[in-house]
Amino acid sequence: VTVTVASALLLGTAGCGVLVETATLKEYAASDGVSIDIGDLHVRNALIITNEVGDAALIGSVINNGSSFELLTVELRGTIGNSTQIGIYPGLTKLGIADDNPIVLYGAGVVPGQYASVYVQYGANDGQLVSVPVLDGSLEIYAPYVPEALPPAVTLNP
């Protein structure tokens, strides 16, 4: 009787995972940022770091699997004039890290804890609109990337 019960339990539980999707097979960004794939360009761990006035610094990295230099267009949606082009050579390009390519969009009005709509495109490839997380420098790891605010404009009195 004991062997029969043990066999029944073993067979009854042996197939538990058959109908359940394995979590390790799902692709996801295992970081705070997001990933974007457009043609030969693969953006990894893209996120925005902001300061107290809402300026936006884009950080992350781009892998160019192609053999030619490309211009990547990054546009922060919902703001006027907040777009830039970034030169991406074959191989790895860091964005906003170690002064390789500082990318700051001043006056963006982004808020930490929210997502910013960012359109990314290059060459003749279709672009993608993605939601990029916005963080501030409260976490020590991101503090060095907080953009410096522009100095106040100088006005001359005649």
Please identify what each model-predicted range represents.
Residues A23-I36, L129, V134-P158:
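Extracytoplasmic/periplasmic copper-protein system
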Residues R77-G107:
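Intrinsically disordered, low-complexity Pro/Gly/Ser/Thr-rich segments with frequent PxxP/GP/PP motifs
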Residues G17-V20:
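Bacterial signal peptide processing site
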Residues L47-L71:
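Short, surface-exposed binding/anchoring microloops in extracellular/periplasmic proteins
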Residues S67-G81:
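Short acidic, flexible loop segments centered on an aromatic residue
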Residues L11-G15:
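C-terminal motif of bacterial Sec signal peptides marking the signal peptidase cleavage site
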Residues V53-I59, G109-S117:
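Short, solvent-exposed loop/turn segments enriched in Ser/Thr/Gly
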Residues I36-I49:
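N-terminal edge beta-strand
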